[in-house]
Amino acid sequence: SKTGSGISYTLTENFGLLPGESHSTVFYWGLGFEEVAAATSAKEMLRRGWDWEYQRTTGWLNQRISQMETPKLTEVYNTNLFFCIFYSTGLTLDTEELVCATSRSTRYYVSAAYWDRDVLLWAFPAILDADPQLAEEILHYVFGRQRRNLGIHSRYIDGTVLEPGFELDELMAPVIAL
């Protein structure tokens, strides 16, 4: 339904449970550049089913989990690792190109901007440890899309200048990452 502030959706299901019973409901929500791509991505998830999607996701995560000396250290390391992967990298909807971002939080004043220091000095080491192929893709992005403005304070994800001004740590972060 359309509201004054945009479009909203309500999804409901009615069911009854007897003692000891449980119930699951799965909603598939597709994303795409336009409505056909979004609908067919949801349809593909529906075709494969919840179990397949769950196994694929947990398999991907399990391949990247590191075991540390203690359970607590393992938990902290992997929580931070997956934060680094999921909040500093992503694929664009229009070109499916890998991009890196300093933050995806709407609370951060430069959400979805790119800073070499944040991505390469803070997130990259953990990503390199867990997923060398993704780390290589990040370096291609940095030395490709972001190359023309290395050393500039901050940039948009397409490489253009957001906040001008030279910063040595921004210039050296790609060198250190190599």
Model-identified regions with their sequence ranges:
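Acidic/polar, glycine-enriched structural segments that form the non-catalytic walls/loops
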Residues: 1-113
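Aromatic-rich carbohydrate-recognition surfaces in CAZymes
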Residues: 46, 110-178
